[in-house]
């Protein structure tokens, strides 16, 4: 599949590159970044490499997936935003989830909203997704605010069976 790149005011959303592994692994080794992901466990470099490989396979199979997100000004990787299948939450399947994760230095600058807006528009307009969900663990209200800013509404409150943590599921339906 041809490369996809989306440029926003401050960000570039693009496919993953080999040189992304080290900054991605560093982000996923930060306990504060990983606090609200699954059971809150940090990831090893090997797990991160596998995640990038899986993301690229997802792209090849579906024509969309997780974008690596870099700052346009510095061309440094600051996180990701895009699409995955939330198989960890069987009660909402089948679904496509929009997700994001950013390095701590990128928090509070509006990057998650900027990236998620661009990715969501790509999924709905360019790839014809009809419904997209997003999930956050109760306590991580910053992610909930991003969901609301990009036009999503609360759909369900439930428990993540893999972590036992309460989560809120938001969705948006393209009419």
How should these model regions be labeled?
Residues 1-36, 66-175:
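Acyl-donor (CoA/ACP) binding surface of acyl/acetyltransferases
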Residues 56-68:
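A short helix-loop-beta-strand connector motif used in the catalytic cores of GNAT acetyltransferases and
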Residues 32-54:
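Conserved GNAT-fold acetyl-CoA-binding loop/helix
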């Amino acid at each position: 599949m041809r490369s996809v790149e989306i440029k926003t005011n401050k960000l570039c959303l693009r496919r993953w590159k080999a040189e992304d592994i080290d900054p991605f692994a560093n982000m996923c080794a930060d306990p504060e970044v990983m606090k609200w992901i699954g059971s809150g466990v940090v990831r090893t470099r090997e797990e991160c490499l596998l995640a990038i490989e899986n993301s690229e396979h997802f792209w090849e199979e579906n024509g969309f997936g997780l974008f690596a997100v870099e700052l346009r000004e510095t061309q440094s990787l600051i996180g990701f935003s895009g699409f995955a299948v939330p198989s960890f939450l069987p009660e909402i399947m089948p679904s496509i989830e929009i997700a994001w994760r950013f390095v701590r230095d990128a928090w509070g600058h509006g990057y998650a909203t900027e990236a998620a807006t661009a990715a969501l528009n790509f999924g709905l307009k360019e790839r014809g997704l009809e419904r997209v969900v997003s999930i956050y663990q109760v306590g991580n209200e910053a992610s909930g605010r991003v969901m609301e800013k990009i036009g999503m509404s609360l759909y369900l409150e439930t428990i993540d069976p893999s972590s036992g943590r309460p989560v809120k599921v938001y969705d948006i339906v393209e009419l």
